[in-house]
Amino acid sequence: MYIGEKIKPQKGKILNNLKKLKPSFSTYVIVLDFREKQIEIYHNIIFINICKTQKSNRFIIIGIAANKQEAFRLVRDIVQDIYKVGVGLDFSRLSGLEVK
């Protein structure tokens, strides 16, 4: 999982809140969307609302960030790591927090 520098001290609390679908106001999540087959960035409140209304296992959280700028940096890091390893966008090789 990719964790932004500004959010590292609160990592445990934020991940627990996400598992419980409980919002944190200044957090962005980076997710794999299996239906759309792409990486997406959501403010966590919007993401939680999507999870509650759709009730599907279409997302895996692969990163959390303190703000949108940090989320963009993490996505850049993810893409660079994917191409270093040479897996393309093979979602099965990325791990994260499954949202149910």
Model regions and ranges:
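Negatively charged, low-complexity tracts enriched in Asp/Glu with abundant Ser/Thr
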Residues: 1-19
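A broad, low-specificity signal for short, low-complexity segments enriched in glycine/proline
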Residues: 19-26, 99
